[in-house]
Amino acid sequence: MSNNKIKRKDASPEQEAIESFTSLTKCDPKVSRKYLQRNHWNINYALNDYYDKEIGTFTDEVSTVAHPPVYPKELTQVFEHYINNNLFDIDSLVKFIEELGYNLEDLATLCLAHLLGYKKLEEPLKREDFLSTWFMQGCSTISDMQECIKTLDVKLHEDLQYFTQIYNYAFNLILDPNRKDIDTDEGIQYWKLFFQPEYPVRMEPDLLEAWFRFLRDEGKTTISKDTWRMLLLFFKRYPTIQKIISDYDETAAWPFIIDEFYECLQDQQ
């Protein structure tokens, strides 16, 4: 893979995004930062926003920008290989993921979805989003892309900031249309993946099992976005049942469901 910015160890994720955005758009880094910040550092959303506001539309890039990127033939061939009826749809994505060496249940798939700017996995991916993303990462072949995702997978295991970003991103990605909450069973499936010992946020296994048991015993059928996000902070601060019992502050701004969990643990002592 040539000039893969993901592998840089001396730059923060934000700085990497600014450099990639600036390289593609040729705009001032301050402008890059502005668009990235207001799009929560998702480079594909920021690019769409930039081209809409500064130039016209993202899809008009080729006709409007003086020097549009020329994508390598190998890269366009990868895209063409996976499309169905000119769409990179969910079936295309599943096949692509499998040929990268993963499956939909792997957390690395979330890294891929985040990189490509997916809001929902069921929505077709635009040609420009696919090509521009891999072009910015210096990837033209499946082999290049495999190395890129391996690098992100390692980052997910080692970088707490990136892990938190992917964890928070996952909620909206798995949320069904026209709903505000996810089913508890689905939440549990993903928590079992995110809170494996090899990832940055570690807690005693008994604590995670106690949380699952509490949800089931109390008939909690759905999980809100606030609960999803705050649970990660909760486990960072209180990695053991004993620490919760001894240090938990009921006056702090935790969701009510976490207060209930604390009371449940107290009753079991």
Swiss-Prot record:
Could you tell me which SUPFAM superfamilies the record lists for this protein?
UBA-like (SSF46934)
Q: Where in this protein does the record say Phosphoserine is found? A: 12
In terms of superkingdom, the source organism counts as Eukaryota
Q: Which residues form the DCUN1 domain?
A: 70-266
Residue ranges annotated for the UBA-like domain, each copy included: 14-51
Swiss-Prot/TrEMBL keywords: Phosphoprotein, Ubl conjugation pathway
Q: Which InterPro entries match?
A: DCN-prot, DCN1-like_PONY, PONY_dom, UBA-like_sf, UBA_8
Name any one GO molecular function.
ubiquitin-like protein binding
Q: One biological-process term from Gene Ontology?
A: protein neddylation
GO cellular component terms, semicolon-separated:
ubiquitin ligase complex
Oligomeric state and interaction partners are given as: Interacts with the cullin CDC53. Interacts with ubiquitin via its UBA-like domain. Interacts with RUB1/NEDD8.
Describe the task this protein carries out.
Answer: Required for neddylation of cullin components of SCF-type E3 ubiquitin ligase complexes. Neddylation of cullins play an essential role in the regulation of SCF-type complexes activity. Does not act by preventing deneddylation, but rather facilitates neddylation, possibly by acting with HRT1/RBX1 to recruit the Nedd8-charged E2 UBC12 to the cullin component of SCF-type complexes.
Q: By its UniProt entry, which PANTHER family does this protein fall under?
A: DCN1-LIKE PROTEIN 3, RP42 RELATED
Q: What is this protein called?
A: Defective in cullin neddylation protein 1
